[in-house]
């Protein structure tokens, strides 16, 4: 799971002046951060059409030069503001458009680059959650204290502080009960004398009383589609939102809509449909451009059934010109929190930086031959029928080609379409390399439209992309033209088509567990519906990114299922990897599996069976490893999960780079973990020597075995961290890497690797340290080092070993079993950190030996003749030795695989 980084349009450094643009380049609001004048406290002029937010922060150490405040608003870009020292401590000021209601902020400490969108190593002060301040009047001022999550106000410049007193939430629990949460929990509402509920016309709603739970009871039911306000004397009015009511059976029965949403382009008409049950009005805005200019065309949507809104217009005008197609659009949605402009969550493309959706005739984006596009398996001679037939290679789009010197499309989708590319040593790279390696699927790190990269900039930028902006839109920075929304769609399809033509399937990394910010398009359209909240109205943060999506709510579930099936059907994708899948409820993932496999029974579905923090979703409903049995039952090819048991067993805990595992440190104590993974998570303690995890899988198809992924250190970096980089340790380090890979490739389950593991990928910082979380590191850290492959290099030799492992696995059904029993895997011998076992598949029998010790060990072959296909340095489909019997010597730090003749 990657860290959340929100999109930044950052500063240009001109002498000592930083210019920050917090929405678009032409909407700076006068935010020119100039040097402090001696003896004067920093101020900032606020131009007409803007309002101002000032944040004071006090740090006991008095040191502010390694800190800043990350601020954002209106779902737009974020900006990092450095502190100006003042009598209170430090202060920042930001001007925002006058229609801004809330501003989000994070006080960041331990910044390596204060004032810039660099998040590596930062520590959030006060709380890990995103914080928000509600603006009032032309100027809002808050005071913060280091280590304190509260916001304060002051009448004397910060000498005395009072908790900021505001109505934190007015929650419609039912149509007649409004639960009020105050920022100061000690404040109780005891009388109606200073309380009013106002409807959209400002008329008072009759009130019955107040119960002992700070709940206001109305005399008449409220209409969820009307914009009610709660007024309490001496507080700013707040909109009433049905946060709790959203989860009631009454709401679900009245507003769960199962029809098509989004834009539908027909031969004669174009229809628009949006689900916004709490809206009092919705207006469609049409733009000629995806980024610049104002909308001159507006259409009022009509209220439809179950909370939907719709508009249908003629596709062509009187002159035969398109009214909508290839133009851009947003919705202005009026709810209890005001009128906010939002991008349609169902938008299929967007303008640069995703601020406006695009209306497309999708057929016009298809490359030539697209109607015949299909994943036909590797080289046409290998069938991927079960998950266990797959061999997955995880890659970031930019990493793949950014260092291919003769690529015309460095860092772009189209780099996957190029053939004949070679590195400086004449070794095939790019797509040709993948075909030679033999993997069956590429797993693309997030390639939907994410927030953290400025698509309008030609400057080098990098992010993994785990900060979703527009889920159904391809990321624009990987297209050759990010401004024209048609290009990214067409080029994404070309990428998929080229990989399919090479016999390689495409798996998309999807991140439906959270959005880049809670101030998202979802929340502008239906405030508080799409996210989980704690009992006191604070966003639940099981993602570790400030928010989490409420997948258990029917319309969130519908969006997730609709989104996945859209990508599958429109882009011919062959599978999906779910980030932090533990934050999705079981019902949602079951429905995803059913719909995806109804369209393509061979599609792969897998995810991280854990969360990124505490969540309000019940543990019994989480799609996590402990619930893998509840999720899949006895199903083969259901929803697979990453096997962290074998991962840590092979190389040591990912939470401690100095820890070593069975393969990297000959730790016998980790052997049970390894054997648990060898049998695909099946319950069989006789095989594991008594070890069992907290979960079990009835089928190896539902378990992803791996030792490296984009998260954490690379396998090679872990080995080098412990063993050093001296030439004297090179042979043993290479052996440990090969043994680790061999364990994954000879285990039952689905083999998975981070791209470049097979060429000893390293992520080394400029100072020589190893980067374990390179989500926003430089290209130099993240790129695949293709030029490391030469005919004599250890990287090339290691790649050849991986190639042989993959080929042997593909030629050996016993390693790809979809169903097993207690007799499938049998221990032959155990001798410390050396184990020999058999895998039996009918008449096919393998003897596999893992020797993690540094000395050779003798293993006696069972009766019959055996052929050796894999040893410590060689692997493939041609026998290394044939017709072997009796005792065999197994080299130290190696895997040997014998097949019965």
Indicate residue ranges for each PLM-predicted region.
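Substrate-binding/active-site clefts of carbohydrate-active enzymes
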Residues: 349, 396-571, 589-600, 604
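Loop/helix patches that line or flank the sugar-binding groove of alpha-linked glycan CAZymes
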Residues: 698-866
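C-terminal beta-strand-rich structural cap/linker in extracellular carbohydrate-active enzymes
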Residues: 104, 880-901
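Short, surface-exposed alpha-helix to beta-strand junction/turn motifs within ectodomains of secreted
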Residues: 65-75, 183-205, 280-298
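The feature marks proteins involved in alpha-glucan
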Residues: 31, 35-61, 87-174, 217-271, ...
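Conserved alpha/beta catalytic core and glycan-binding cleft of carbohydrate-active enzymes
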Residues: 360-364, 369, 593-594, 599-760, ...
């Amino acid at each position: 799971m990657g860290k959340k980084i929100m999109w930044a349009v950052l500063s240009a450094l001109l002498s000592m002046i930083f210019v920050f643009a917090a929405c678009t380049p032409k909407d700076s609001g006068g935010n020119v951060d100039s040097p402090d004048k001696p003896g004067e406290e920093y101020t900032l002029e606020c131009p007409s059409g803007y309002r101002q937010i000032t944040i004071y922060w006090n740090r006991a150490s008095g040191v502010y030069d390694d800190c800043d405040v990350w601020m954002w608003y209106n779902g737009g870009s974020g900006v990092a503001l450095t502190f100006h020292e003042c009598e209170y401590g430090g202060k920042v000021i930001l001007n925002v458009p006058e229609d801004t209601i809330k501003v989000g902020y994070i006080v960041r400490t331990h910044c390596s680059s204060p004032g810039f969108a660099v998040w590596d190593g930062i520590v959030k002060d006060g709380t890990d959650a995103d914080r928000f301040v509600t603006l009032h009047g032309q100027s809002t001022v808050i005071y913060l204290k280091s280590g304190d999550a509260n916001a304060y106000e002051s009448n004397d410049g910060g000498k005395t502080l009072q908790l900021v007193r505001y109505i934190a939430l007015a929650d419609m629990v039912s149509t007649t009960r409004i639960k009020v949460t105050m920022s100061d929990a000690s404040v109780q509402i005891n009388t109606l004398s200073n309380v009013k509920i106002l409807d959209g016309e400002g008329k008072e709603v009759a009130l019955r009383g107040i119960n002992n739970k700070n709940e206001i009871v109305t005399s008449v039911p409220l209409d969820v589609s009307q914009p009610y306000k709660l007024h309490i004397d001496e507080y700013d009015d707040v909109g009433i939102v049905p946060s709790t009511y959203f989860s009631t059976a009454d709401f679900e029965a009245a507003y769960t809509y199962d029809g098509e949403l989004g834009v539908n382009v027909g031969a004669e008409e174009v229809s628009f449909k949006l689900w916004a049950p709490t809206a009092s009005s919705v207006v469609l805005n049409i733009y000629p451009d995806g980024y610049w200019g104002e909308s001159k065309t507006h259409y009022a949507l009509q209220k439809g059934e179950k909370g939907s809104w719709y508009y249908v217009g003629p596709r062509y005008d009187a002159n035969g010109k398109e009214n909508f197609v290839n133009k851009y659009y947003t919705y202005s949605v009026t709810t209890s929190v005001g009128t906010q402009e939002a991008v349609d969550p169902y938008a299929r493309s967007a303008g640069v930086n995703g601020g406006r959706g695009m209306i497309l005739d999708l057929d016009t984006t298809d490359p030539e031959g697209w109607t015949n596009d299909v994943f036909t398996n590797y080289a046409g001679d290998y069938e991927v029928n079960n998950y266990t037939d797959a061999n997955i290679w995880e890659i970031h789009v930019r990493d793949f080609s950014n260092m291919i010197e003769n690529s015309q499309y460095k860092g772009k989708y189209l780099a996957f379409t190029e053939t004949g590319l070679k590195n400086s040593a004449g070794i095939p790279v790019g797509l040709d390399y993948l075909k030679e390696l033999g993997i069956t699927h590429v797993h693309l790190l997030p390639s939907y439209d994410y927030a953290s990269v400025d698509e309008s900039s030609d400057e080098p930028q990098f992010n993994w992309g785990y900060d979703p902006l527009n889920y159904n839109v391809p990321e624009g920075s990987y297209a050759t033209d990010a401004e024209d929304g048609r290009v990214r769609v067409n080029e994404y399809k070309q990428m998929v088509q080229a990989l399919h033509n090479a016999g390689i399937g495409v798996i998309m990394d999807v991140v439906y567990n959270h959005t880049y910010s809670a101030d998202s398009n979802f929340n502008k359209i239906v405030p508080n519906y799409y996210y989980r909240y704690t009992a006191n109205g604070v966003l639940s943060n099981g993602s570790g990114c400030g928010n989490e999506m409420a997948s258990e709510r029917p319309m969130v579930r519908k969006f997730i299922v609709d989104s996945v099936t859209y990508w599958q059907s429109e882009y011919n994708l062959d599978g999906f990897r779910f980030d932090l899948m533990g934050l999705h409820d079981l019902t949602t993932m079951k429905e995803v599996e059913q719909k995806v496999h109804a369209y393509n029974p061979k599609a792969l579905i897998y995810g991280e069976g854990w969360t990124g923090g505490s969540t309000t979703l019940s543990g019994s409903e989480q799609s996590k490893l402990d619930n893998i049995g509840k999720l899949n039952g006895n199903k083969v090819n259901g929803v697979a999960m990453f096997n962290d048991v074998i991962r840590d067993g092979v190389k040591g805990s990912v939470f401690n780079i100095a820890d070593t595992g069975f393969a990297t440190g000959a730790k016998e104590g980790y052997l049970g973990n390894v054997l648990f993974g060898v049998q695909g998570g099946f319950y069989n303690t006789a095989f594991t020597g008594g070890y069992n995890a907290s979960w079990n899988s009835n089928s190896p198809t539902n378990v992803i075995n791996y030792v490296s992924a984009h998260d954490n250190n690379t396998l090679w970096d872990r080995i080098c961290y412990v063993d050093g980089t001296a030439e004297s340790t090179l042979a043993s380090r290479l052996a440990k890497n090969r043994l680790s890979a061999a364990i994954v490739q000879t285990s039952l389950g689905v083999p998975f690797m981070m791209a470049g593991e097979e060429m000893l990928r390293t992520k080394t910082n400029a100072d020589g340290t190893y980067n374990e979380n390179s989500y926003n590191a430089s290209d130099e850290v993240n790129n695949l080092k293709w030029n490391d492959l030469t005919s004599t290099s250890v990287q090339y030799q290691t790649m050849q070993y991986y190639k042989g492992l993959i080929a042997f696995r593909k030629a050996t059904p016993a390693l790809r079993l979809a169903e097993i029993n207690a007799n499938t895997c049998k221990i032959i011998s155990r001798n410390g950190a050396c184990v020999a076992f058999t895998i039996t598949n009918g008449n096919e029998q393998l003897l596999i030996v893992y020797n993690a010790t540094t000395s050779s060990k003798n293993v006696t072959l069972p009766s019959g003749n055996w052929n050796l296909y894999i040893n410590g340095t060689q692997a493939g489909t041609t026998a290394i030795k044939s017709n072997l019997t009796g005792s065999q010597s197994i080299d130290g730090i190696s895997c040997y695989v014998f097949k019965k003749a």
